[in-house]
């Protein structure tokens, strides 16, 4: 078959125009084009048709060294990547090339990164809780198996550490596979995560097929085209795991979904589209919907997705985080004020929500304890202005007791993480759901009113808090 060959006519940053001289043979939108620059394969994705013979493309690699007149070949299909068992333990980029120095990904099947979401009849609506072993999450914003969870937070409040702890806890306690998509984040963090996974046995270098995770990276230094598509590459790998062998439960981590939106905004501006609110692309909701609607559970298997969402300037009303809210089953909001108190994970217990915190799903006891904890913390929050102006002495005895319990609850919501052992020196703790509920039930009922606040800080179960209290007296 004769190849459809074009020539580069214009290069502006990550946007490349290609002219095809074969009349009537203009490649389709989203097709991948290939050209070679000093033996390096460069992939271009068609975004627009301009006139009768020219296509405008977004580059997936750096355009340095490209010149006008270079030959470009139409591959005849969208970007396609290797999927299946062979991707386990490997790191690949947006176009499916291995970037871990371990050679080609052999024997795997190939799949396009563009697919339609499963139909209504294929989707599953069962609701089961996924226990994470993190107290504040399991109690106040429980995760659903096959649900979508958003981690919202500004810069430096602990989104990536929380994601790494979830990978550690859930991937070990849970038999399924994990896919991690690094979208526009720090290369150093991606490298650290890879080596931690090797150390913890999640990645097996000797026998890669025994690994539990596949990694897909498009980090901060990549062009906007790569960052805008790498989440789709990761999702395609996750879908292949979900649909194989009569179904699997898959965990899909994205760090960071905001960078997906940000890259889309850069691409949109380069293509000359008129921006919408706050300078974002006019297709913001569509882009987000196309990604999120594919992250779903079918009757065969499930994809449980955890997405870190950077909040620009800590403003939750910014269009990028606000657009993702609509797609999520649970939202975990990380608060700078709580991080400043030294309480980690810095989850805001009043802002974080979950659709499954419902007595019909989690049970009456869990629901009542969670609501009581939130009620005590809300009362404490409303009393803080009075305390700041008049001091504790002006409060009624009942309010003083509420404040005392709230401060203990606040500290008991902290927990030492396995992945943070290296820099805290404290052994990480996985807390079962029953222990979490029992501990907070005792606190709300006043069973531990006589213990010092410090006993509840950075412990796992309530038994550990009681032991710690003995050493403090």
Curated annotation (Swiss-Prot):
Function according to Swiss-Prot or TrEMBL: Produces ATP from ADP in the presence of a proton gradient across the membrane. The catalytic sites are hosted primarily by the beta subunits.
PROSITE patterns noted in UniProt: ATPASE_ALPHA_BETA
Enzyme Commission numbers on file: 7.1.2.2
Catalysis: reaction(s): ATP + H2O + 4 H(+)(in) = ADP + phosphate + 5 H(+)(out)
SUPFAM superfamilies in the record: C-terminal domain of alpha and beta subunits of F1 ATP synthase (SSF47917), N-terminal domain of alpha and beta subunits of F1 ATP synthase (SSF50615), P-loop containing nucleoside triphosphate hydrolases (SSF52540)
Domain of life: Bacteria
Binding site for ATP: 153-160
Organism: Rickettsia bellii (strain OSU 85-389)
Keywords: ATP synthesis, ATP-binding, Cell inner membrane, Cell membrane, CF(1), Hydrogen ion transport, Ion transport, Membrane, Nucleotide-binding, Translocase, Transport
Membrane topology: Peripheral membrane protein
Gene: atpD
Protein name: ATP synthase subunit beta
Short name of any one Pfam family annotated for the protein: ATP-synt_ab
